[in-house]
Curated annotation (Swiss-Prot):
<dbReference type="Pfam" id="PF03776">
    <property type="entry name" value="MinE"/>
</dbReference>
<comment type="similarity">
    <text>Belongs to the MinE family.</text>
</comment>
<keyword id="KW-0131">Cell cycle</keyword>
<protein>
    <recommendedName>
        <fullName>Cell division topological specificity factor</fullName>
    </recommendedName>
</protein>
<dbReference type="InterPro" id="IPR005527">
    <property type="entry name" value="MinE"/>
</dbReference>
<dbReference type="InterPro" id="IPR036707">
    <property type="entry name" value="MinE_sf"/>
</dbReference>
<keyword id="KW-0132">Cell division</keyword>
<dbReference type="GO" id="GO:0051301">
    <property type="term" value="P:cell division"/>
</dbReference>
<comment type="function">
    <text>Prevents the cell division inhibition by proteins MinC and MinD at internal division sites while permitting inhibition at polar sites. This ensures cell division at the proper site by restricting the formation of a division septum at the midpoint of the long axis of the cell.</text>
</comment>
<dbReference type="GO" id="GO:0032955">
    <property type="term" value="P:regulation of division septum assembly"/>
</dbReference>
Amino acid sequence: MDLFRAFSKPSSKDIAKERLRLILINDRCSMPQEVLEDIKEDILKVLSKYMEINYAEIDVRMTITEKVEEDPVALVANIPVKKVKYNK
């Protein structure tokens, strides 16, 4: 590890690479709201077979996560469950 490089400015190549990465991530995240609503409805349709859902507090969105470098775009769904239906 080169200690001097750790404190130096990033090179223009590294800056350009990071900017391109952010542009590509943003491009992947841009999805029409209608498509996201269709996905949300399909997910809720399936989940409602197995559980009662609090529809007032549902949050489904596309987001960028820094945890995964290869594919940082994620669909995040926060769906509060009231009760699990167990019918066998």
